[in-house]
Regions:
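Hydrolase active-site cap/lid region
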Residues: 227-276, 333-336, 342-346
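Short beta-strand element of the alpha/beta-hydrolase
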Residues: 92, 104-112
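Gly/Ser-rich "nucleophile elbow"/oxyanion-hole loop immediately N-terminal to the catalytic nucleophile
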Residues: 172-219, 235
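Surface beta-strand/loop "capping" patches
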Residues: 353-393, 415-420
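N-terminal cap/lid segment of alpha/beta-hydrolase-fold proteins
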Residues: 50-100, 141, 177, 182
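Short beta-strand/loop motif that positions the catalytic acidic residue
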Residues: 299, 305-307
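Short amphipathic alpha-helix adjacent to the substrate-entry channel of hydrolases
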Residues: 121-139
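Cap/lid segment of the alpha/beta-hydrolase catalytic domain
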Residues: 112-115, 138-190, 245-258
Length: 477
C-alpha cells in the first residue's frame, strides 16, 4: 500500500496510534548551536528569542517499517499584524522514525506548500523510503515560506518569489533588517531541527537521540538550505537543490548577457524593480544578509548540489561563478533533461545515495575537472572507480539557451572510456556545433555495495563557443 493512501486511511479511518495533543515550549534565548550568534542580521534574527515557538503533536501512526508523527509547528512571529495578515508562522512538520534506528544524524527536508488549507500535508513517500533504508529519522518541514501573505501596503496575495521580491523591495527602500523573507524562512528550519531533537527524545517520539542534521531543499528552500547551514552548527552536510545562483550578481549579469532578457521565471523580481538596484550599496548590504556566497567561510561541511540542465531560472554554467570558491568537500550534479521541478528524473536517488553515504560513513568519491581550452575537458576521480561514465550534450542552433522550455528534453549521451588502466582519468574533446551553441558535461555513476541506489555526479556544464551574444546589452539583477 502506498504511504499516502495508508496515511489517509490511518488518519481518518480510526486506526491512528495516538490522537492526543502535546504542546511543548522551547526557549531560544540562548542557543548553543549558533555559529555566530551576533554575526549578521540573519544570525541575530534566527537566534532572537520568540515566545510564539511551540509545537503540537497532531497524529502518530504505524506505517510498516516506520512510525510517522505529524506535528504542527509554530516557528515564530515575523512582522506585526499591522504589516502583514499572518505574522505567526505555522508549519506541518512530518517526522518519520524507522523502527530500527541506526544513526543519530537526521535528514531535514525543507518543503513548500500553502497555509490556505487546514488539511494535513502527508509525508512524502520518498522521504519515508529514505528513513527506512537509512535507519535514520527523516523529517519534512512544510510551508516555507508561510504563504500566501498579504502585506498591508500592498493588498495582494503573494506566494514564493513574489513574496520574496516584495520583501527585498522593502529592505532596499527602508534599510530595515527585519524585511528579507530569508530570515524567517531560515528560522523556521532551525526551529524544525530544535523540534525534531526535542520530540524524538520524548516517550512519544521514541526516546531517540538526534545529534546533527543533513539539510536539503529545492529552489527557495534550497537557498534556505544554504543559510540554515550558515547559521547552525548542527548541520553536518547539505543538499541544496535547483538553486544554482550563488554569487548572484555576476551570475545574473551572465544570465542577461546570454539571453538578452530575464527569463520569465525571475519575472517577480523584475516586476518589483529589483534589477535596478544591482550595483547599489543597498543591494550589496542585502546580499551580505541573504546571499549564501557571503557565508562561504562558514560553509565548509560536505555539500552536494543538485541542479537541472534545463532549469527555467538558472543557466547550466552558473556553477562557474561559485563552485571553485567553495571550501571543504563538495560535489555537484546536473540532471540531464531536468527542469526546475526535477519532475520525472532520478534526482531523488542522488539525495538518497549521498545521504546514505554521509550517515554511514561511506566515502563519497571526489571528482576534479578542468577545461584548458573550449571543448576540452579532463576529469579525475579519487576514492572509487565509476561504474559508468557518460558525456551528455545538447545543442541550440538559435540561442545560448538550454531551458527545457526552449529546446525540450534534447540532451543525449554516449559512453566514455578512461584514458588509462586505472579507470580514474578521463579526457574528452567536444567540437562546437556548425551553428549556435552546444552545452556538455561528463556524468559519473558510482555504486557502493552498501548503498540502496547509485550515486551520480557530474562536472560543471560547459558551453561552446564560450561567447555571450548579448554582452553589450545592459542588464542587472
Amino acid at each position: 500500500m502506498k504511504l499516502g493512501r495508508f496515511l489517509q486511511k490511518r488518519l481518518y479511518g480510526g486506526l491512528v496510534l495516538g490522537s492526543f495533543l502535546m504542546i511543548i515550549k522551547i526557549s531560544a534565548a540562548h542557543h548553543p548551536n549558533a555559529r555566530v550568534p551576533e554575526g549578521t542580521a540573519l544570525d541575530r534574527y534566527v537566534y532572537q528569542s520568540d515566545a510564539h515557538f511551540e509545537y503540537r503533536l497532531v497524529r502518530s501512526m504505524d506505517a510498516g517499517k516506520v512510525h510517522v508523527h505529524v506535528l504542527e509547528l509554530t516557528s515564530q512571529k515575523w512582522l506585526t499584524a499591522d504589516e502583514v495578515d499572518r505574522p505567526i508562522w505555522k508549519h506541518w512538520l512530518n517526522i518519520v522514525v524507522p523502527k530500527n534506528v541506526l544513526s543519530d544524524t537526521s535528514l531535514l527536508f525543507i518543503g513548500g506548500g500553502s497555509n490556505k488549507s487546514d488539511s494535513i500535508d502527508e509525508p512524502d513517500e520518498k522521504l519515508a523510503t529514505i528513513a527506512a533504508a537509512s535507519g535514520s529519522v527523516v523529517s519534512e518541514l512544510k510551508m516555507v515560506p508561510n504563504q500566501p501573505l498579504v502585506f498591508a501596503d500592498d493588498g495582494e496575495e503573494r506566494y514564493e518569489d513574489a513574496l520574496i521580491a516584495y520583501s527585498w523591495d522593502k529592505y532596499l527602500k527602508t534599510g530595515d533588517d527585519k524585511w528579507p523573507a530569508r530570515l524567517p524562512m531560515t528560522k523556521a528550519a532551525v526551529r524544525a531541527m530544535d523540534t525534531v531533537t526535542e520530540f524524538c527524545s520524548t516517550d512519544k517520539g521514541g526516546q531517540i537521540s538526534v545529534r546533527d542534521f543533513v539539510v536539503a531543499g529545492g529552489s527557495k528552500r534550497g537557498w534556505t538550505t544554504w543559510t540554515t547551514a550558515a547559521v547552525d552548527k548542527r548541520v553536518r552536510a547539505i543538499f541544496p537543490i535547483v538553486i544554482d545562483m550563488l554569487n548572484v550578481v555576476p551570475s545574473f549579469k551572465h544570465h542577461f548577457n546570454a539571453y538578452g532578457f530575464y527569463a520569465p521565471a525571475v519575472g517577480d523580481y523584475e516586476a518589483m524593480g529589483i534589477m535596478d538596484w544591482q550595483d547599489s550599496p543597498e543591494y550589496q548590504k542585502l546580499m551580505k544578509i541573504v546571499e549564501p556566497f557571503e557565508y562561504r567561510d562558514r560553509l565548509t561541511m560536505p555539500k552536494f548540489m543538485i541542479n537541472a540542465t534545463g532549469d527555467q531560472f538558472f543557466l547550466p554554467d552558473s556553477w562557474r561563478f561559485y563552485y571553485d570558491q567553495l571550501e571543504g568537500p563538495k560535489n555537484i550534479r546536473y540532471v540531464p533533461n531536468g527542469e526546475h521541478s526535477l519532475r520525472d528524473t532520478d534526482a531523488w536517488e542522488t539525495l538518497m545515495a549521498g545521504y546514505f553515504s554521509i550517515i554511514h560513513d561511506l566515502a563519497i568519491p571526489e571528482l576534479e575537472w578542468e577545461s584548458a581550452s573550449p571543448g576540452h575537458l579532463t576529469a579525475k576521480v579519487t576514492g572509487a572507480s565509476p561504474k559508468a561514465v557518460k558525456i551528455w550534450h545538447a545543442d541550440n542552433p538559435q540561442a545560448r539557451d538550454f531551458r527545457v522550455d526552449t529546446i525540450g528534453r534534447n540532451w543525449v549521451s554516449q559512453d566514455v572510456l578512461p584514458t588509462d588502466a586505472s579507470g580514474l582519468n578521463y579526457n574528452i574533446q567536444m567540437d562546437s556545433p556548425e551553428k549556435g551553441w552546444r552545452a556538455f558535461m561528463l556524468e559519473f555513476t558510482f555504486k557502493h555495495p552498501k548503498s540502496p541506489v547509485p550515486l551520480k555526479m557530474t562536472t560543471g556544464v560547459y558551453v561552446i563557443p564560450d561567447t555571450l551574444p548579448h554582452l553589450d546589452n545592459k542588464g542587472s539583477l
